[in-house]
Amino acid sequence: MSALNSLPLPVVRLLAFFHEELSERRPGRVPQIVQLWVGCLLVILISMTFEIPFVALSLAVLFYGIQSNAFYTKFVAILFVVATVLEIGSLFLIYKWSYGEPLIRLIIAGPILMGCMFLMRTHRLGLVFFAVAIYGQTFPAMLDYPEVVVRLTLWCIVVGLYPTLLMTLIGVLWFPNRAITQMHQALNDRLDDAISHLTDSLAPLPETRIEREALALQKLNVFCLADDANWRTQSAWWQSCVATVTYIYSTLNRYDPTSFADSQAIIEFRQKLASEINKLQHAVAEGQCWQSDWRLSESEAVAARECNLENICQTLLQLGQMNPNTPPTPAAKPPSMVADAFTNPDYIRYAVKTLLACLICYTFYSGVDWEGIHTCMLTCVIVANPNVGSSYQKMVLRFGGAFCGAILALLFTLLVMPWLDNIVELLFVLAPIFLLGAWIATSSERSSYIGTQMVVTFALATLENVFGPVYDLVEIRDRALGIIIGTVVSAMIYTFVWPESEARTLPQKLAGALGMLSKVMRIPRQQEVTALRTYLQIRIGLHAAFNACEEMCQRVALERQLDSEERALLIERSQTVIRQGRDILHAWDATWNSAQALDNALQPDRAGQFADALEKYAAGLATALSRSPQITLEETPTSQAILPTLLKQEQHVCQLFARLPDWTAPALTPATEQAQGATQ
């Protein structure tokens, strides 16, 4: 701690960020690291033994191909095979018609690159077209002999396909890491966290982590549906299980048992609830659908309401009473292309900008006859992202990974290479480098590309097309400079040529999240099966919506073409909306425990006041006309007297509404007026 206290605050924050990113714990990460590590060592052994060129390309195939589970790895392997066929076919067409004519070659290669970038952004299988765009764009200009060009192109088939076969053998056939196993482990981990917060007074986890865990469960559910027949047969029950576990995990994260009176009835009820959650854990671990015969007694229902756990209890019991053979709801098949693929000009502009950046880099390195920096063209394709903020993020990751890889390559060449005599020693030295790269590459999606870029840059500088000791430091310099040049050119193009800013999209994204929250408020607050299932599904959608808004805020913060004050004001308001939206969701959860005691006819009217106010606020976000909602709670007749607990909970919701930012003000100021009907 003393060492950290002596560091500047930005450095401490950076170290904390990387610690959070790189220490991610998720099911399947350790097997993925081992598969990637062993695969890299086998690629080096095979390439050095049979003198196969372009070893860096083979390593890149592994890093992009080996995924967190066997099904995903198999799916990506199929895409790589298709991409290799398309890529080699397009290259041969370019050679056949335009090898001796550089201008014609550019005229043909340009539309191919544009088409790939357009489809990468608009098609579901965008990874295929990304691979076609990134492969072999510079080979025709790098060599003067047609026969050598053809041979190297044929080598590309081997370079692309044998790592694909290798990762299929390792990750799919020999040591498969099944999605169903990861799902069982993830569900049990989430329930462990929930029980800990139920029984002990713990600090709540960050909401961003809760949302990411919820999204991870949804992704695993998709893989389980595609990979496991038993899961598909009982998919309705398992999807309800995932939704229930997500709800219990996210709700109990903010639960503090010390804030309620510890009567004997409440203590016994919590123990009973924890016991039922443990039974669910055991059933999930065995891959069985959990069934429960527990019914709430009158005393348990009172205790559950007193400690604000009745809704969680009812949700859990409905899962335990659900028929495992309930037929699933048919899922709608998503379209292959985005809806506005041929009407939105941003997609074609995106392709044109990428082509323009590549042409500038091609003209530069061809004009100065400096073929070693051809990585600048690859950089233009790799960092091409839909908007300015995400492009800058990718540029930082690529530059950071390239810098680390270049430093490792320099140290390796100067300090280690002179002492190596055989392939065994080489593999022993490369093992920790590849293990480090695999560990980083399997971390959070926001920073994983650093590991891939580090290993590829290291291989380009030390292992590319050499099958013995090499001491050429020029390669290290050229690869690093090529990446820097490509990054600078791309930054200039994406900033000043049709910049796709998310500053206007962010308020619309926030409005969508708040609109979803208003739908939650319109669901009748009754312990009825259909209402609860709808409520849980929309809640999961809210986790995804708030997480997407949070990530968009981070990207907008990088858009330096915007006015600094306007950007800071937009981000501050947006983060306030996200924070208040999360608080409103949890506060509304608390009202479910008391609202069911109201008359059914009265409930929708009261809930409708909140939903209407939130929808009105969301509608004004796009035009910056939203003001903090002021809600007046209607008086209830004596015959329909509202419970004191519910009144206090709804007053708290009113206070949260009043703290939503006023977008018409010139600067973000805290709300000065208290919401009507609210109490401090």
Curated annotation (Swiss-Prot):
GO terms for biological process: response to antibiotic. Keywords: Antibiotic resistance, Cell inner membrane, Cell membrane, Membrane, Transmembrane, Transmembrane helix, Transport. GO terms for molecular function: transmembrane transporter activity. GO terms for cellular component: plasma membrane. It is a multi-pass membrane protein. The chain crosses the membrane at residues 43-63, 75-95, 100-120, 125-145, 155-175, 399-419, 423-443, 454-474, 480-500. It is found in: Cell inner membrane. Could be involved in resistance to puromycin, acriflavine and tetraphenylarsonium chloride. Could be part of a tripartite efflux system composed of MdtN, MdtO and MdtP. Belongs to the MdtO family. This is Multidrug resistance protein MdtO.
